[in-house]
């Protein structure tokens, strides 16, 4: 998917990109490839692949969920900024917070935000487990996103505490998502969530499977969650 095809594909879904936004995506791609030579940000560096598997894939959530109704987003384990920064470029009104445990990624994201002229973006170098116990962030976000960083039961413990009551947790997964959901149902319920919607679709060009789950926060997460760093991964609630 080259930049022109990317622009057309988004327009077909109702997302019209301005010249400024197209330039932001171009600069994002160039910077990602340039910095990737110094640090491991992504295995995907071919332009067509980046536009499809990073940019388009990140924005695909907006084909099913109305991002104009959210003000604050927290992205857990965003790595090189996916999915939240491509979404931010398309929906500039959003205030985006990214949490990642690797300091070097924060350095990249800081430089990227400056280069792209992004405002209302905040980067936190922290473990999700610690961040979720921080009163300044706990139950403060309209929407929390995670893109395939861990199993759904683990993600629920890391992300649900950050979602405000009435807000949403958006999980983006590739294949075998239904199986993961079944093992995560207990955790989702325990942390105050309810699976509201599931969207299954294929990524264009390569036709690979994608799944998006929207989990609504119906009640507060018990105070003891998330547990201390490393525990959710070692002893997932299933």
From Swiss-Prot:
Family membership: Belongs to the methyltransferase superfamily. RNA methyltransferase RsmG family.
Higher taxonomy: Bacteria, Bacillati, Bacillota, Bacilli, Bacillales
Location within or outside the cell: Cytoplasm
InterPro entries according to UniProt: rRNA_ssu_MeTfrase_G, SAM-dependent_MTases_sf
Gene: rsmG
Keywords tagged on the record: Cytoplasm, Methyltransferase, rRNA processing, S-adenosyl-L-methionine, Transferase
EC class of the enzyme, as a word: transferase
Source organism: Listeria monocytogenes serotype 4b (strain F2365)
Signal peptide region: none
UniProt-recorded Gene Ontology molecular function terms: rRNA (guanine-N7-)-methyltransferase activity
GO cellular component labels: cytosol
Sites where the protein binds S-adenosyl-L-methionine: 77, 82, 128-129, 147
Disulfide bonds: none
EC assignment: 2.1.1.-
Source organism, top-level taxon: Bacteria
Statement: the UniProt record of this protein carries the keyword Chaperone: no
Pfam family, one: GidB
UniProt protein name: Ribosomal RNA small subunit methyltransferase G
Chief localisation class: cytoplasm
Known role: Specifically methylates the N7 position of guanine in position 535 of 16S rRNA.
ATP-binding keyword on record: no
